[in-house]
Regions:
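Conserved acetyl-CoA-binding loop-helix of GNAT-fold acetyltransferases
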Residues: 115-128
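A short, internal acetyl-CoA/4′-phosphopantetheine-binding micro-motif in the GNAT/acyltransferase core
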Residues: 106-115, 144
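Short, flexible/disordered intra-domain loops and linkers
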Residues: 29-32, 148-163
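Conserved catalytic-core motifs of GNAT/GCN5-like acyltransferases
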Residues: 94-97, 141-143, 158-164
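Conserved GNAT acetyl-CoA-binding A-motif
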Residues: 102, 130-152
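Short amphipathic alpha-helix that is part of the acyltransferase structural core
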Residues: 2-65
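A short helix-loop-beta-strand connector motif used in the catalytic cores of GNAT acetyltransferases and
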Residues: 64-79, 85-88
């Protein structure tokens, strides 16, 4: 599938072939069928490294696998592949006991594939899936760095009283 820019223009820099598919969740991390799952988890780690300079906020493979046993949320992952390699993911959490109209999405795109329409394609596919599950509200989480504290010349985090 060809991805085009926002205004429908087709620029060679912005048009890449992207395949969106649901990720198979393995029973174990040490089987051959876990390769795509491990690659998807690695996308999240790389995005957090690029965004925060650390992978402290990234799920490890076992943590991610254990999420799928949560009795309160149905978890799904859609992946974006370019030339067979996973370049982006959208994790989809569908609450099962309350907020049944909600789908929570977490979007991660490898830095070298950002701003090329990959994220848009993943979000469109996730929205379609969520609507098919009867969800009418979507909450999207992405990782973006906040302003650096070094940018603040005046101690703006401290009230004028000096307390706090």
């Amino acid at each position: 599938m060809k991805v085009s820019g926002r205004n429908g223009w087709d620029d060679a820099r912005m048009a890449i072939d992207v395949k969106i598919e649901q990720l198979w969740i393995p029973d174990s991390l040490d089987t051959p069928d876990a390769a795509d799952f491990l690659a998807a988890v690695e996308v999240g780690r790389k995005v957090r490294m690029q965004t925060w300079g650390s992978d402290d906020l990234a799920y490890g493979p076992l943590e991610k696998l254990l999420e799928f046993a949560d009795p309160y949320e149905r978890q799904l992952i859609l992946v974006a592949k370019v030339d067979g390699a996973i370049v982006g993911t959208v994790d989809i959490a569908l609450p099962l006991t309350d907020h049944l109209d909600l789908a929570e999405l977490t979007l991660d795109i490898l830095p070298e594939y950002q701003r090329q329409g990959v994220g848009r394609r993943l979000l469109e596919a996730a929205e379609h899936l969520a609507r098919g599950e009867g969800r009418t509200m979507i909450l999207v989480d992405t990782n973006h760095p906040g302003a650096s504290l070094h940018e603040f010349q005046q101690a703006q985090l401290v009230p004028g009283s000096g307390q706090g």
